[in-house]
Regions:
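Gly/Ser/Thr-rich loops at beta-strand to alpha-helix junctions
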Residues: 112-119, 219-223
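A structural signal for isolated positions on well-ordered beta-strands in alpha/beta enzyme cores
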Residues: 107, 213, 242-244
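A phosphate-binding catalytic loop at a beta-strand-loop-alpha-helix junction
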Residues: 214-228
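Active-site signature of alpha/beta-hydrolase-fold catalytic machinery across serine-
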Residues: 124, 227-231
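Active-site-facing substrate-recognition patch
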Residues: 3-107, 123, 137-208, 251
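Long compositionally biased, domain-poor regions of proteins
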Residues: 127-137
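ATP-dependent adenylation/pyrophosphate-handling site
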Residues: 231-251
Length: 251
């Protein structure tokens, strides 16, 4: 089953007759992706290409991830209780497949987000699996102002630097220099790996972990997950890391 977008009513629902945007049945899930730094990322629901509209017709809202946007309340999209129940039914069958694969984590670390969806997903994984402890706030986003400061030290092409600066300044225009920067504000995905959008946050005094499971709502370029894993390895050199996301990549 996939997702159907009712553009007129800004409503996203689960549809059993196709796999547009995502495969949400236990069959075919979870999926695995390996990022550039070797990080293994498992996704509960794989993503597919949405149904293409006719030439000249505006694409449906949601940037090819309409259900994610609906769950986060973005683009004025919404969903139904029935659709959430359908997804949860599949999730409860898919998660045990990942747990049974053998990676037993000490910590679950949700990545910071402007929405509470990632935190809720992390809590659900923790309670459903009964494995590890969930630590919120271990990773935080850097400010847009800090992104601009870091940009000056990067040894990259002048054209790339200019494009990133333009994207960050556009973000600041609609927010503020102190606002936590959102990596998706850089529309050219090839430029995102130049930016480290995260830094270490705060954790109470705890025993260093042997294994950590990073949690995010979706993986696209994987920039944030790569940065988070690099931060962890710098702090805990021997730690083993994997990542789990709600929705996968369309790659």
């Amino acid at each position: 089953m996939g997702f159907t977008v009712d553009v007129a009513n800004r409503l996203v629902t689960v549809d059993h007759s196709h796999n547009n945007y995502s495969v949400t049945t236990p069959a075919g899930n979870p999926t695995v992706l390996t990022l550039s730094n070797g990080l293994k990322v498992t996704s509960i629901f794989s993503r597919t290409k949405g149904k293409k509209g006719k030439r000249g017709v505006k694409a449906p809202p949601g940037d090819n991830s309409p259900m994610l946007y609906a769950l986060k309340g973005m683009h004025q999209l919404q969903t139904t209780r029935r659709a959430v129940m359908d997804l949860n039914l599949s999730y409860r069958q898919i998660l045990p497949v990942y747990v049974a694969a053998g990676f037993q984590w000490d910590w679950l670390l949700p990545l910071p987000s402007s929405s509470n969806l990632t935190a809720l997903f992390a809590n659900r994984v923790c309670s459903r699996s009964g494995v590890g402890v969930c630590h919120h706030g271990a990773m935080v986003k850097i400010s847009a102002q800090q992104v601009l400061k870091n940009l000056e030290a990067l040894q990259i092409k002048a054209t790339d630097r200019s494009a990133i600066r333009e994207a960050v300044n556009r973000f600041i225009k609609y927010n503020s220099p102190q606002t936590a920067f959102q990596i998706k504000a850089i529309s050219r995905t090839s430029l995102r790996p130049y930016i480290n959008p995260l830094m270490w946050g705060h954790l109470p005094a705890v025993v260093p972990p042997r294994r950590v499971l990073l949690i995010d709502d979706m993986v696209t370029t994987g920039t944030s997950l790569v940065c988070a894993s690099d931060i962890l390895r710098h702090r805990y050199p021997t730690v083993q890391i994997e990542a789990l996301t709600l929705f996968g990549s369309t790659k």
